[in-house]
Amino acid sequence: MKLKSLPIAFFVSLISFTLSAQNTSSSFKIVGYYPIDQAMKADTSEVPFDKLTHIMLAFVNPDSLGNFKQNFAALTPFTKAAHTHNVKVLYSIGGGSYQKQYHALLKEGKRQELIKNLVLQVTRYEADGIDVDLESGYAFGPETDPNYGIFIKELAQSLKSKNKLVTAALPSSPGNVVTNEVLSQFDFINIMSYDHTGPWSPDRADNHASYSDAMDDVKYYLNTLKVPKDKLVLGVPFYGHGFGPALSDPVIPWMTYKEIVSTYAGAEWVDHWHLPNGYIMHYNGIPTIKNKTQLAMKQVAGIMIWELTYDVPGRKSLLNAIYQVASAKK
């Protein structure tokens, strides 16, 4: 067949495929969390699959009896669209809000049934694994759950027997139940390198996710916890926390990056913005996100985003900034 006889559409398709293959062939991960309720009704043509390697659907949690009542079938178009772009889809359990039902469900007897149900949903709806985001009260905090470790080990065993992934979202300093043996079960770990301060610490009115924090968190996982670099992913926030000018001032609500840059012209180029009445919003702008991406490419295996719907399209996009740095170094 002569090349000149091929239609232009063929070359456009070929170029698109090649670029996609280049994006996914690299071992560097770009992981994004995405709200599960929005995924169920998303216009998949507007989801930036081409700039991601993994999407975590947040959150999939059972009721007190261990039953999952989400409409998983409604996620099928989203999952298929992701797979078309070679993006893996994981169901994330837990979340920042306290999920007290897991304490009972992680106990002997109920734990095995919970794992069975999780694996069933993953296999039935062709997801790629489970992301464990059990936070305060389980993996860290004043109290932890003694069954966290055995749950992770048994979950990993069940998922890996089906060639599925098990990952985690863990804080800067996880609790003592997160042992080296537990850490070794995860295919990779998303370090939640944010919320170092916030409304709960009004005396620390500063950036909750500085570049310095990111360096310290990566160093802790590499040097203290001895986690191999190819299992670590650096988390970055697409939101900010605000503080008043004095300790007596009420803390203003947090804002998404989308809200910040849509309201204040030029806010994408800095890490804080002075709001009316003396308040200051602290977040990560494009330069810091690019610097963190460079840090991640040098020291760990990827970068994670909380969360994708907090971003904006176009030149102000933080995901675009991440992708520009990551693709330039591939």
Describe the residue ranges of each PLM region.
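A cross-domain feature marking catalytic cores of carbohydrate-active enzymes
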Residues: Y34-I36, F59, Y91-G95, L134-S136, ...
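Short, well-ordered coil/turn segments that N-cap beta-strands
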Residues: S26-F28, T53, H85-V89, E126-D128, ...
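Bacterial Sec-dependent N-terminal signal peptides
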Residues: M1-T24
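Glycan-recognition patch characteristic of GH18 chitinases/ENGases
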Residues: N23-V122, N207, S212, S327
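Active-site and adjacent substrate-binding regions of carbohydrate-active enzymes
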Residues: D133-V166, S172, T288-K330
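Substrate-binding surface in catalytic domains of secreted glycosidases
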Residues: L65-A73, K116, G137-S262
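Glycan-binding loop/region signatures in secreted carbohydrate-active enzymes
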Residues: D230-Q299, N320-K330
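Conserved, mostly hydrophobic/aromatic
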Residues: I55, Y91, V132, I189, ...
